[in-house]
Amino acid sequence: MNVTMHSKKLLKPSIPTPNHLQKLNLSLLDQIQIPFYVGLIFHYETLSDNSDITLSKLESSLSETLTLYYHVAGRYNGTDCVIECNDQGIGYVETAFDVELHQFLLGEESNNLDLLVGLSGFLSETETPPLAAIQLNMFKCGGLVIGAQFNHIIGDMFTMSTFMNSWAKACRVGIKEVAHPTFGLAPLMPSAKVLNIPPPPSFEGVKFVSKRFVFHENALTRLRKEATEEDGDGDDDQKKKRPSRVDLVTAFLSKSLIEMDCAPKELTKSRPSLMVHMMNLRKRTKLALENDVSGNFFIVVNAESKITVAPKITDLTESLGSACGEIISEVAKVDDAEVVSSMVLNSVREFYYEWGKGEKNVFVYSSWCRFPLYEVDFGWGIPSLVDTTAFPFGLIVLMDEAPAGDGIAVRACLSEHDMIQFQQHHQLLSYVS
């Protein structure tokens, strides 16, 4: 397989950003993010238009979209905790693959990196790297794969998916039809000079491996049934609580990882465990904010399980449900931004503390289910597959398996040692494909 790079440049907004918009203050929630890049990969099997025309239209509409999301084309100033909206541009690459898309998808998992390979220079070899980068990959069959990377400082998955849908709409029907993003978080929750939170742990020297696993709908139905049977001695109230598919898969994966923690040491007892999820706070508080506000607006859910001997899936879903329910109930009453900021900081503080201490199994998850990633339509239909790439730390991402249905695709990023065990786990293999 050969990859030819046809274009590599910094793409700027089609219209210069006005002087009064050239600084965007970051919120406290932006400030506390780990500044890593999140990758998104969108597969489109066949394009109806000439590929040259398609690429030109994608480039011009992306440039127009940057006039609305002008901060994305700027640069991060960590000293002042602002984004300098100076129109320096985002990374932009066009490549051509000499194979058909279906052949590419049959290849190694590492092929996903090829879909973003042209972006590495932008993101790692400059003193002030772009906050986002896009790579367009054309295939022999007329298929297209769009790889995107966003610095987490500029926003969460809600913000990233909104940007991609805005670009797609600009390409499909014109920039005038695209809604302007809103930036209301920083005035309510300004950045702080001193953050009283521990740093996240360092994973320097650890080699992480990323693999994709799919729980089809029928597998989830079977898993739910077997989890209920496993809890045969549970009370009637517990049996009535039907966990969401995200909680179900999270609990099953956590159970598998707990068993992995015991196996090499031949232990009958595991360490206590902490299941960590990120909860979108939009529409959950009483704050005077737009429902589609851009930026980072989520809280960390720390669900602890103190069961150290053969935890059941229902034990773990109960821990998750309890932790999520408590946060939902608390934030629903809050109309004070300082209280929300304090709650978020406390959740991050607990997460980083336990993550770094190493006395518990800490399993970090992020659910992208129900975000409109499968709605990103540039004019030739929705993507046939949406995926992500590796992360610089242990993380398990849950995504919708396909445009329709309730299956879940899991992108697991684990240490090389843990991934070997994970792929051989007998129960996992019976549910995933």
UniProtKB/Swiss-Prot annotation:
GO terms for molecular function: acetyl-coenzyme A:acetyl alcohol acetyltransferase activity. Pfam families: Transferase. It catalyses: benzyl alcohol + acetyl-CoA = benzyl acetate + CoA; (E)-cinnamyl alcohol + acetyl-CoA = (E)-cinnamyl acetate + CoA. Keywords: Acyltransferase, Transferase. The active site is at 152 (proton acceptor), 377 (proton acceptor). InterPro entries: CAT-like_dom_sf. It comes from the Eukaryota. Its EC number is 2.3.1.224. Belongs to the plant acyltransferase family. Involved in the biosynthesis of benzyl acetate, a major constituent of the floral scent. Can use benzylalcohol, cinnamylalcohol, 3-cis-hexene-1-ol or heptanol as substrates. Has some activity with 2-phenylethanol and 2-naphtalene-ethanol. This is Acetyl-CoA-benzylalcohol acetyltransferase. It comes from Clarkia breweri.
